[in-house]
């Protein structure tokens, strides 16, 4: 799903990675605020099994449209650290990556001892303080 924006918007983008069960309002707010500050669009990597967007993401999309912010949503069955890093590093326009927390990503990692975040070519923002992240069902 892609949204159009005003032509004045730069090619810079914020990458927002959303894992199913870890959707926190602070995550969406952090990504939106960074887009505003940087004058950037938003690429969203969404790990979600349903056919309809989660209500919080749908609300974010509506806000982005209303504000004229370009966005793109890519949906996945699962999302690993490596996937986020690879996407960010292969898209030159990504200025920063926003995730909920560093915690919990190892659960589906092939190698739990590796640290793909160390290979990220741009800043990584965690929106939820450690120890406050819990999987929601």
Annotated model-derived regions:
Residues 17-21, 47-49, 75-76, 99-103, ...:
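Structural motif
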Residues 3-58, 65-67:
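Small/aliphatic-rich secondary-structure junction motif
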Residues 61, 84-92:
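Short, well-structured alpha-helical segments in soluble
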Residues 56, 79-85, 112:
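Short acidic active-site motifs
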Residues 1-11, 129-137:
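SAM-dependent methyltransferases
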Residues 59-78:
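A glycine-rich helix N-cap at a beta->alpha junction
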Residues 89-137:
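Gly/Ser-rich helix-loop-strand patches that form or flank binding pockets
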């Amino acid at each position: 799903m892609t949204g159009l924006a005003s032509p004045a918007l730069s090619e810079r983008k914020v990458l927002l990675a959303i894992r199913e069960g870890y959707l926190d309002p602070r995550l969406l707010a952090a990504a939106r605020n960074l887009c505003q500050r940087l004058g950037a669009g938003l690429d969203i990597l969404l790990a979600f099994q349903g056919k309809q967007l989660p209500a919080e993401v749908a609300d974010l999309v509506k806000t982005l449209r209303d504000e004229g912010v370009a966005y793109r949503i890519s949906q996945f069955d699962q999302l690993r650290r490596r996937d986020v890093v690879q996407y960010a590093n292969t898209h030159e326009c990504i200025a920063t990556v926003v995730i909920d927390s560093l915690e919990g990503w190892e659960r589906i990692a092939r190698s739990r001892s590796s640290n793909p975040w160390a290979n990220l070519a741009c800043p990584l923002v965690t929106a939820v303080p450690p120890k406050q992240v819990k999987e929601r069902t």
